[in-house]
Amino acid sequence: MVINDFTNTNFVILAHLYNEKNNENVIKTTQDEVADKLQLSRVTINKAFSLFVQNGYLQRDLKHVGRYYLTDLGCTVVENIRTLSVEVNMLSQKSLIK
C-alpha cells in the first residue's frame, strides 16, 4: 500500500464504498451514484476506482458490468485508517488538556 493512494478524496471514496458494501463485500452502487452522493466529478470517481482496482482494494465483478467487490485489503485499509484517526484524535485531545 502506498500512502499517496489515500489522499482525503480517495479515502472518502473508499470509505463510502466500505459503507455501501453488503455482507459479501459487493458494492452495487454505480460510479455515477457515488459521484452524486459525494458531490465529486465522475472523472474523479473513475480515477479512484481505477487506482483501487490496480492496487487490489477493489475487484471488478466479471459477471455484472459496473459492479465491484471491496477486497479484504480494501476493508482492512479503511478499518486501519479509521482506527488510526481515532487514536490520533485522542492523542491530540490529551495534548490539548496538558
What are these regions (language model features)?
Residues 1-16:
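Short alpha-helical segments that sit at the start of domains
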Residues 8, 39-54:
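Short amphipathic alpha-helical interaction segments
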Residues 15-22, 82:
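Short, locally clustered residues in the helix-turn-helix/winged-helix DNA-binding domain
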Residues 27-37:
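A short alpha-helical element within helix-turn-helix/winged-helix DNA-binding domains
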Residues 64-72:
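Minor-groove-contacting beta-hairpin "wing" of winged helix-turn-helix DNA-binding domains
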Residues 74-80:
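Short, charged/polar, Gly/Pro-enriched secondary-structure boundary elements
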